[in-house]
Curated annotation (Swiss-Prot):
SUPFAM superfamilies: C-terminal domain of RNA polymerase alpha subunit, Insert subdomain of RNA polymerase alpha subunit, RBP11-like subunits of RNA polymerase. This is DNA-directed RNA polymerase subunit alpha. Residues 342-353 have a biased composition (Acidic residues). GO terms for cellular component: cytoplasm; DNA-directed RNA polymerase complex. The gene is rpoA. Residues 241-353 are annotated as: Alpha C-terminal domain (alpha-CTD). Its EC number is 2.7.7.6. The N-terminal domain is essential for RNAP assembly and basal transcription, whereas the C-terminal domain is involved in interaction with transcriptional regulators and with upstream promoter elements. Disulfide bonds: none annotated. Keywords: DNA-directed RNA polymerase, Nucleotidyltransferase, Transcription, Transferase. Homodimer. The RNAP catalytic core consists of 2 alpha, 1 beta, 1 beta' and 1 omega subunit. When a sigma factor is associated with the core the holoenzyme is formed, which can initiate transcription. SMART domains: RPOLD (SM00662). It comes from Rhodococcus jostii (strain RHA1).
Length: 353
């Protein structure tokens, strides 16, 4: 956390479907960041259930009437859009309304299957006269947000199947405000007040918990960038990091013999990174730098997990004369290491004279 005091969340229940939540303290500016994210998620991304299509007995399309029914089909569909249902099923389910007049048809007349609940049974659907009769088949599905009727139209639907606009979101209204709050001696921290009103299919508390879970899952993608996102390797691995660090080492740290060190310095090679950028041919072009010196450099670089630009990956230091497998080091009995003796700068291997 950015501050030492962990934010707290409290709930004030205003009604069965409405609560006010307070989150504090938050770093300055985070009240709006969190409030806007939660509000947008609550209004658009909370899963719910809704009617996606209907079929009315004796009706072929929505621009008609039903004998004995006061409302036309369009009005009936508009009324059904206000139906609040909850479903535990992932697959579409079917509900039925069968009513004989006279009287009103309400959502309480709907017969839902197991796992489906009608949460506003008082919703008015239609009005029947003495001869009125209404039979409706309703398909209910789960989803998120709002889906227009044109998208609910199935390609192989039977004649008389009427698609309906689906309002899946169980959240009716969300408002928030940010106030100042005090933490120790500072008074510029944020206090987020979130007012959530839902339909009867879910409580405000459950809606906020669902929104928080959705945001955590999405923000988790960014959090994984600190380790490794799927399909993307972010930053060097530990081994690569060691190699990168080794490139900046001065060649003095390689503990080369005096002749090898002096030859490289005269050539302008000062770091390990500059050395690994050379090939064996490049080094042989250096005056007084012979094969023995190249073998020494290759062994020293191998101890760091590095190699010359053209060195084969299969290089085996044990094949080099002077290599001690027990200690993993190379020594030249004919010449001391850098700093062991004076006056050796002009020492040269005979094959390079």
């Amino acid at each position: 956390m950015l501050i030492s005091q962990r934010p707290t969340l409290t709930e004030e229940v205003i009604a069965d479907n409405r609560s006010k939540f307070v989150i504090e303290p938050l770093e300055p500016g985070f009240g709006y960041t969190l409030g806007n994210s939660l509000r947008r998620t609550l209004l658009s991304s909370i899963p719910g259930a809704a009617v996606t299509s209907i079929r009315i007995d004796g009706v072929l399309h929505e621009f008609t009437t039903v004998p004995g029914v006061k409302e036309d089909v369009t009005d009936i569909i508009l009324n059904l859009k206000g139906l609040v249902v909850s479903s535990e099923e992932d697959e579409p389910v079917t509900m039925y309304v069968r009513k004989q007049g006279p009287g009103a048809v309400t959502a309480g007349d709907i017969v839902p299957p197991a796992g489906v609940t009608v949460n506003n049974p008082d919703l008015h659907i239609a009005t029947l006269n003495d001869k009125g009769k209404l039979e409706i088949e309703l398909v209910v599905e789960r989803g998120r947000g709002y889906v227009p009727a044109v998208q609910n139209k199935a390609s192989g639907a039977e004649i008389g199947r009427i698609p309906v606009d689906s309002i899946y979101s169980p959240v009716l209204k969300v408002t928030y405000k940010v106030e100042a709050t005090r933490v120790e001696q500072r008074t510029d921290f944020d206090r987020l007040v979130l007012d959530v009103e839902t339909k009867n299919s879910i409580t405000a508390r459950d809606a906020l918990a669902s929104a928080g879970k959705t945001l955590v899952e999405l923000f988790g993608l960014a959090r994984e960038l600190n380790v490794e996102a799927e399909g993307i390797e972010i930053g060097p691995s530990p081994a690569e990091a060691d190699h990168i660090a080794s490139f900046g080492l001065p060649i003095e740290d390689l503990d080369l013999t005096v002749r090898s060190y002096n030859c490289l310095k005269r050539e302008g090679v000062h770091t390990v990174g500059e050395l690994v950028g050379r090939t064996e041919s490049d080094l042989l072009d250096i005056r007084n730098f012979g094969q023995k010196s190249i073998d020494e450099v290759k062994v020293k670089l191998h101890s760091l997990g590095l190699a010359l630009k053209d060195s084969p990956a299969s290089f085996d230091p044990t094949t080099v004369a002077g290599y001690d497998a027990a200690t993993g080091t190379w020594s030249d009995t004919d010449a001391g290491s850098f700093g062991d003796a004076e006056g050796t700068e002009d020492y040269a291997e005979t094959e390079q004279l």
